[in-house]
């Protein structure tokens, strides 16, 4: 029976849908008018709507005409007419909500109407999806609708140059993945000039598969990093060998639910004996604890052929949800190196963070945000609290006919898989297509072996075979097809009964050498014929599958999240098609083992229940639901915790990025640098005079410190003579005199190098100083967060301590930026070469304003790392992506490894 809250929410949903339906009715009234327009007249509607919006008419008022235009254009280009429920979804998206629409309801087409409407402002629209394939596919297909209406479509994928990316972002509607959009945001905030920027403002984003991107992937931040300077660390191999001698429950404990480890007393003693140290937890040994913890995690929590595979001598992560190999991706904070050491392959060096942001805070930076998914209701509260997004459940175009069978539970995994194969064989024999979901590469290959032994032809989608993934999924609805997919592999590609005609037609057009972007007229002329051929080819097969019962979905294990289970089930029964689903479980499945071991153990130990008996006890199903609720609650709490800590960083990040952008856009820094001079000199004087009387102050040391900052032009004697002796010297007088002297020195510096040269030098030096200190600050904040949990032992709230200390560190960083910039501006060699008399490719140089060539020693050509690493969440929110590139304009400060410096500083303090 639904709760009172559920009933209230249902009433609220009905009211929202009723208001939206009135708008849909207005669109429908315009349909005949727009159908009567010629292609040219329909195209001209875009110019008319843009002009009306520019004159002050709101997008809400323009919505009926804009949606009617898109509906008509889609019919003429794709042969697809928006259903009323698709227009409802589009209205929900325009209003900044999440539209929950079941699988097969045509969410890709839904996004076209709100994207077009919001692009009328000229400020750009981003359509975000989960992988490069879907971004390109959707941009190509839906781009035909937008081009027909006179709008440009772009797509952002990995490997594009900055020039190409800039062009794609300049389009009216740009498709891409969450990681690519986020990385470009970070790269833009590492830029040294406006010419390096690629993105426009964050105006409006429509996030496809929004639950995957904003929920599953929210715990893993986006990170751009470069190789840290310093010696390669030998400790990974040392600790990999050491932990082989340690025993679980004796030397260390493992919490599989929380995925954490803890070292026990006997283990600590063994480590100390092995390393020849007296106390592992002394300050100078702190870094060793991280190596030890990572080595134990690599041994106990990360399993080969489940969490990762070893291919060509490299450890490659496996996506937990899709089962695909995430080529080039790496775990953070030394964990990947620990796994490499465990497997005996080459250990690649650590990296230092150059820029980072969580997806939560990246997407909260959009002026308006919306999303689509088939499964959002279970996370509605989190969407509202974190992103301010409401969830609107859109009714299906046709009532669902899928039958969801009760779970079948067996005592062990072997019997379970035998039953799965028997079921598949029976369905396959009558021509019913079957989609089987597994939770790991290992299990998909085990099932594949069993199917092969029974002579059942099948396709496998997992980490070792994903090149043809979308094509295989698109045809998984053909008669008798058996497809084994590691969880949600191929999500975003519709499984249509009999085969996906649209996908087949697109592939055929590619074979014919036709490209919708390069030659849209030729493409549109040939498309109807090719699509008709594809539809005819699948028509008979469609009828055959309908008679066999539709797509049968088999789950071989419950996922931690009910939402993922629902996504698997949702592959069947699209658009009112018949279908069926069932989950086969065992009491040894990971979910039961970790979260309800007592229930599982009691049944397994019961002699009255044979191994091959299928269990359908109500309390078993209840135990599974409780286990899933526990995991979902834990994951939600982790995401909330990540956000709380990142909110502290986000305020700092916004301040730094806003500052950098104003400098790039040409802010005159003269007054700011003068304040830098005042603050830097003032801080040094304050530090020298904060204790004791004037007679106690070490003025000789003060003058030496100032001489490292700027050329001091006033002597101690000058100051003392001015005040009448040392006994009458006041700190504020000393500070005033020295600040005045420093400002005079800066005026002399300007006279020496020239105003124009100094203004450009100020811009470069301040940017370089911000970049250098921000990178260092990111490390310091990470270091602070790693140990902040220990404050709870002292009865202190870790988050409050993190906020307080983080603020202090941020203020110290700003002081460091000021002092560093002042020192460089005084001491670096600044020169201005004559302006060039001509430019390559410019015939009339008189038409170009020629500026002098400014050179600032040490920062003219920022050093870039040979390889940048781009780390972000995979489709399961767990993994990290790595690829090389130096096109971002990022700078890396040279120097020793910061962990080594930190350790040295600790030793110094102890000494």
Curated annotation (Swiss-Prot):
It catalyses: ATP + H2O + cellular proteinSide 1 = ADP + phosphate + cellular proteinSide 2. It comes from the Bacteria. Its EC number is 7.4.2.8. Residues 856-911 are annotated as: Disordered. The keyword Cell wall biogenesis/degradation does not apply. It is an enzyme of class 7 (translocase). Residues 876-889 have a biased composition (Polar residues). CDD domains: DEXDc_SecA, SF2_C_secA. Belongs to the SecA family. Part of the Sec protein translocase complex. Interacts with the SecYEG preprotein conducting channel. Has a central role in coupling the hydrolysis of ATP to the transfer of proteins into and across the cell membrane, serving as an ATP-driven molecular motor driving the stepwise translocation of polypeptide chains across the membrane. This is Protein translocase subunit SecA. The gene is secA.
């Amino acid at each position: 029976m639904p709760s009172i809250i559920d009933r209230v929410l249902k009433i609220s949903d009905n009211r929202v849908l009723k208001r939206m339906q009135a708008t849909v009715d207005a669109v429908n009234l315009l349909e005949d008018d727009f159908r009567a327009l010629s292609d040219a007249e329909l195209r001209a509607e875009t110019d008319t709507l843009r002009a009306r919006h520019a004159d002050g008419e709101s997008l809400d008022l323009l919505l009926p005409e804009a949606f009617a235009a898109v509906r008509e254009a889609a019919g003429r280009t794709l042969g697809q007419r928006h259903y009323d429920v698709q227009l409802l979804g589009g209205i929900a998206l325009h209003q900044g909500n999440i539209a929950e629409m079941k699988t097969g309801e045509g969410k890709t087409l839904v996004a076209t109407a709100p994207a077009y409407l919001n692009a009328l402002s000229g400020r750009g629209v981003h359509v975000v999806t989960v992988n490069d394939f879907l971004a390109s596919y959707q941009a190509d297909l839906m781009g035909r609708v937008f081009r027909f209406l006179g709008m440009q479509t772009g797509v952002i994928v990995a490997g594009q140059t900055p020039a190409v990316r800039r062009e794609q972002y300049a389009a009216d509607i740009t498709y891409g993945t969450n990681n690519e959009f986020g990385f470009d945001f970070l790269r833009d905030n590492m830029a040294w000039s406006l010419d390096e920027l690629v993105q426009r403002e964050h105006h409006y984003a429509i996030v496809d598969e929004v639950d995957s991107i904003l929920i599953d992937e929210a715990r893993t931040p986006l990170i751009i990093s470069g190789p840290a300077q310093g010696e390669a660390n030998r400790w990974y191999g040392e600790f990999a060998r050491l932990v082989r001698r340690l025993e679980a429950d004796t030397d260390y404990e493992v919490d599989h639910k929380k995925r954490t480890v803890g070292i026990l007393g006997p283990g600590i003693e063994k480590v100390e004996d092995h390393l020849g140290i007296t106390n592992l937890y002394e300050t100078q040994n702190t870094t060793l604890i991280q190596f030890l913890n990572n080595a134990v995690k690599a041994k106990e929590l990360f399993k080969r052929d489940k969490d990762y595979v070893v291919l060509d001598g490299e450890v490659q992560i496996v996506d937990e949800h899709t089962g695909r190999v995430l080529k080039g991706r790496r775990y953070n904070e030394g964990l990947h190196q620990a796994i490499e050491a465990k497997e005996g392959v080459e250990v690649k060096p650590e990296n230092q963070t150059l820029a980072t942001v969580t997806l939560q805070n990246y997407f909260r930076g959009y002026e308006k945000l919306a999303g689509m998914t088939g499964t959002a209701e279970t996370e509605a509260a989190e969407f509202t609290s974190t992103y301010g997004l409401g969830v609107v459940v859109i009714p299906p175009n046709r009532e669902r006919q899928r039958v969801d069978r009760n779970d079948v539970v067996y005592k062990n995994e072997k019997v379970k898989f035998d039953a799965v194969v028997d079921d598949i064989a029976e369905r396959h024999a009558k021509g019913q297509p079957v989609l089987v979901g597994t939770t790991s590469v290992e299990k998909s290959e085990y099932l594949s072996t069993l199917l092969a032994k029974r002579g059942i032809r099948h396709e496998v989608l997992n980490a070792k075979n994903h090149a043809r993934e979308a094509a295989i999924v698109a045809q998984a609805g053909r008669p008798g097809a058996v497809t084994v997919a590691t969880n949600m592999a191929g999500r975003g590609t519709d499984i249509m009964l009999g085969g996906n005609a649209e996908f087949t037609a697109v592939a055929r057009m590619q074979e014919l050498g036709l490209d919708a972007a390069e030659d849209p007229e030729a493409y549109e002329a040939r498309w109807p014929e090719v699509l008709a051929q594809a539809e005819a080819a699948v028509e008979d097969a469609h009828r055959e599958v309908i008679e066999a019962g539709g797509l049968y979905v088999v789950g071989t294990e419950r996922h931690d999240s009910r939402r993922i289970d629902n996504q698997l089930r949702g592959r069947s029964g699209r658009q009112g098609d018949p279908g069926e689903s069932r989950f086969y479980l065992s009491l040894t499945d990971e979910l039961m083992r970790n979260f309800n071991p007592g229930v599982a153990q009691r049944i397994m130990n019961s002699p009255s229940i044979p191994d091959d008996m299928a269990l359908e006890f109500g309390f078993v199903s209840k135990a599974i639901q409780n286990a899933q609720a526990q995991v979902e609650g834990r994951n939600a709490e982790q995401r909330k915790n990540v956000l709380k800590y990142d909110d502290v960083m986000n305020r700092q990040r916004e301040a730094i990025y806003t500052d950098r952008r104003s400098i790039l856009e040409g802010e005159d820094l003269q007054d700011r640098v003068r304040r830098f001079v005042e603050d830097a000199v003032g801080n040094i004087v304050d530090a020298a005079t904060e204790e004791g009387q004037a007679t106690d102050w070490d003025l000789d040391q003060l003058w030496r410190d100032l001489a490292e900052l700027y050329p001091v032009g006033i002597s101690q004697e000058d100051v003392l003579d001015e005040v009448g002796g040392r006994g009458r010297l006041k700190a504020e007088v000393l500070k005033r005199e020295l600040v005045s002297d420093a400002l005079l020195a800066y005026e002399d510096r300007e006279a020496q190098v020239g105003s124009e040269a100094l203004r450009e030098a100020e811009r470069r030096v301040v940017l370089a100083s911000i970049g250098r200190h921000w990178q260092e600050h990111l490390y310091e904040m990470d270091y602070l967060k790693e140990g902040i949990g220990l404050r709870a032992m002292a009865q202190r709230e870790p988050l409050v301590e993190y906020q307080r200390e983080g603020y202090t560190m941020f203020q110290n960083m700003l002081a460091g930026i000021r002092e560093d910039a002042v020192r460089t501006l005084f001491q670096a060699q600044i020169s201005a070469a004559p302006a060039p008399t001509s430019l390559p490719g410019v015939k009339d140089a008189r038409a170009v304003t020629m500026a002098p060539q400014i050179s600032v020693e040490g920062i003219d050509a920022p050093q870039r790392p040979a390889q940048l690493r781009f780390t972000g969440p995979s489709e399961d929110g767990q993994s990290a992506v790595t690829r090389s590139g130096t096109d971002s304009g990022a700078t890396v400060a040279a120097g020793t490894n910061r962990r080594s410096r930190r350790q040295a500083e600790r030793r110094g303090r102890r000494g």
